[in-house]
Amino acid sequence: MQLNMLKCKLHQACVTDTELDYEGSCAIDANLMDAAGIREFEQIHVYNLANGARFTTYAIRGEAGSRMISMNGAAAHLCSEGDRIIICCYANVDESELDRHEPALVYCDGDNRITHQRNGIPLQVA
């Protein structure tokens, strides 16, 4: 059986720009994409921490080192500059491979600098 599992995420990334009339949906600094393992034109899920919007779009490569996260086209209606977001990708993983599956988790500060990376989420306790 195939299960749809978290492949990677950019956690607490900050929207740097919105371009309603730009072709392409979400431009992400190429260094951030590489760190997380996001491929150009890969489907991404965006969760906006500022307004609760959740939507699906695709990633395009932004200039390396720019720290840009630009929401383009229709996605520009769902985010504002300065909004903190989570960008996730999912992948189908065979049930027999689940014990070896480790998502790439990349954590960002307010300037989209990578603060740390890990391959799992700590246990949430009551």
Swiss-Prot record:
Any one GO biological process: pantothenate biosynthetic process
One of the Pfam families matching this protein, by short name: Asp_decarbox
tRNA-binding found in the keyword field: no
Principal EC category: lyase
Residue list for modification Pyruvic acid (Ser): S25
Post-translational modification: Is synthesized initially as an inactive proenzyme, which is activated by self-cleavage at a specific serine bond to produce a beta-subunit with a hydroxyl group at its C-terminus and an alpha-subunit with a pyruvoyl group at its N-terminus.
NCBIfam families (UniProt xref): panD (TIGR00223)
Record-given protein name: Aspartate 1-decarboxylase
Species, as recorded: Alkalilimnicola ehrlichii (strain ATCC BAA-1101 / DSM 17681 / MLHE-1)
